[in-house]
């Protein structure tokens, strides 16, 4: 296993729309393991392949307290949603920034598991929010896109300053 580099906003590669995964391969299994390792190391609860410059419809998630319930979503589709909620969200691609984002309170997602088997899951709470956030990445959307242009510009400036200080 290896850790992967997480793309940071405003990197334009985060805007690329992911393509469906056609075949489950050993290479895909390695990517999944590397994504989990990266997500856990970065202390995230979800990671979309787009964030690690792999533009395929793949999401890994673990919202459990003990980090022992890894979930894989290949070619996920949001097929139903209800209600409205939201929390202050963060993102591995937008470090040290948080903002309130409106989300559906309850969702149903259809996907393939890591073995290529189809499944559906109903989710609410943190899992529902996390899945919506990660699935946004697959279509080139970031949580900052829900914010006003002024707030988005402030975040961009903050991240540019952080990047300069890291050099």
UniProtKB/Swiss-Prot annotation:
CDD domains membership: Pep_deformylase (cd00487)
Family indicated by similarity: Belongs to the polypeptide deformylase family.
The EC number(s) this enzyme carries: 3.5.1.88
InterPro entries: Peptide_deformylase (IPR023635), Peptide_deformylase_sf (IPR036821)
GO biological process, one term: co-translational protein modification
Protein name: Peptide deformylase
HAMAP family to which the protein is assigned, alphabetical: Pep_deformylase
GO molecular function: metal ion binding; peptide deformylase activity
Active site (catalytic residues): 134
């Amino acid at each position: 296993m290896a850790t992967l580099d997480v793309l940071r906003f405003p990197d334009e590669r985060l805007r690329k729309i992911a393509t469906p995964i056609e075949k489950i391969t050993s290479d895909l299994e390695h990517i999944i393991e590397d994504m989990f390792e990266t997500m856990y190391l970065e202390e995230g609860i979800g990671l979309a392949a787009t964030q690690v410059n792999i533009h395929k419809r793949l999401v890994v998630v673990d919202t459990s307290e003990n980090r022992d319930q890894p979930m894989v979503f290949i070619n996920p589709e949001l097929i139903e949603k209800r209600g409205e909620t939201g929390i202050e969200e963060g993102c591995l691609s937008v470090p040290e920034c948080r903002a309130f984002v409106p989300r559906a309170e309850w969702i149903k997602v259809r996907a393939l598991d890591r073995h290529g088997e189809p499944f559906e899951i109903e989710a609410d709470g943190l899992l529902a929010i996390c899945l919506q956030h990660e699935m946004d990445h697959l279509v080139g959307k970031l949580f900052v896109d829900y914010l006003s242009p002024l707030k988005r510009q402030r975040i961009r400036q903050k991240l540019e300053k952080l990047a300069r200080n890291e050099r």
